[in-house]
Every structure is written in C-alpha cells, then in structure tokens.
Amino acid sequence: MPMDQQVSMRQIRTLNTIGIYHQGTTTDFLYENDRCEEIIERLKLYRSLGVPVGLGTHRPDVIEQSEREGWPVDFYMACMQNARRNREGEPSGFITGKTKAHLVFYPEDRPLMLECLKKVEKPVIAFKLFAGGQIFSGKTPEEKCSAIKNVYEEVFGSLKENDLGAIGVFQRDQNQLKENAALYDEWYESRKKNERS
C-alpha cells in the first residue's frame, strides 16, 4: 500500500532535511495514468517543508512536461535508463513487491535523457549511470575500466557544471567506491589535460 504523504511529511519535518524529491517510479506511474495533478499537488505539499523540491523520473518526456508547464520543482533526479519500458502504467515494485530480476536497460536510453537535460536550467542529479551494472556484463576488468571512463565522458561531458552524477556501488566483493573514485580522478585529469592542449 502506498505511503500516506501527510504521515511522511510529519516524519520528515523532524529530520532537519536539506531537500526532498518525488520518487521516480511513482512520478512515472502517475504520469502514465494521466494523473499529473497528483504529482503537482504533492510537489506543493513538499514545498511546505521550506527546502528544495525535486522530481524524480526515468522518462525525458516527464521533465519536458514539467518544464513546459512550470511544475514547482527546484531540481531533477534523472535516471539514465528508462526503467519504465515494458512496465508502463504499473505501480512501483516497491509498492507491489514485483521483482526487478528481468529488468533490462537499453544503451539508447542514456543519450535520450542527456539530450533532454541539456535544455534544462535547473540542477540535475543523474543516476543509474552504469545501468545497474549491466554495462559490465561479460567484460574483463580492463574493459570495465574503459566502460566506466566512457560513461563518465558521455554523462559528465553533457551535464552542466553544477549537476551531479550518483553512482551505485556494491562493496561486498571489492572496494568499488575507491575504484570508481580513482577512475573518475583519472578520467577528470585526462579531460583537463586535453582541454589545455
């Protein structure tokens, strides 16, 4: 059963939060079912907290509509992969309990979202840069490093200077946090060097 927004707001008020956003799969579900007014009403409710309000989505067309209609948001949480393919109109798996085991991400999704984000002046937090690890499937460690740097180039080369990229890590088998940070530093230094040339 979906969480009661009023109850959630009372709980959030006690936490000294620095921002809040409308969860992406819920945004997309409401959008796909022609219930955008509910999204807008929730955003207005979130605004009462007095902190920046964001909108999460997996769909570029949601951001385009939000921008066109002036929805009350300060930032976007934009998934680089459209997790709504083949699930359009369905509620979030967090609500239904439906597994995501067969969820497949498509490489053509990332450029579509990045193209949309180039037109947005508001700050963006891009996430699922590595397609939930699917871009590494069948790759050697060296190929994985190259794939990571290619994604950094594509994503960070497209985002605005103050936008963010959120990268998930799985620490059980190796220190992915350290590896990702080192690869980012390598990529960034190489990019700066190329810009100076």
Regions found by a protein language model. Name each.
Residues I20-H22, V53-L55, Y76-A78, I125-F127, ...:
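Hydrophobic faces of well-ordered beta-strands that scaffold small-molecule active sites
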Residues M1-M3, V51-Q65, K98-R110:
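Active-site glycine- and acidic-residue-rich loops that bind
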Residues M1-D34:
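Active-site beta->alpha loop and helix N-cap motifs at the rims of alpha/beta catalytic domains
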Residues T14-I18, R47-L49, R68-M77, K119-P123, ...:
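Glycine-enriched alpha-helix->loop->beta-strand junction motifs that scaffold or abut catalytic
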Residues Y21-R35, R47-P52, S92-V104:
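Surface-exposed cleft-lining segments at the edges of enzyme active sites
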Residues W71-T96, V104:
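Histidine/lysine/aspartate-rich catalytic loop segments that bind and position anionic ligands
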Residues P111-S197:
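Structured C-terminal cap/extension of enzyme domains
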Residues P2-I12, R59-D61, A147-V155:
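Short, acidic/polar
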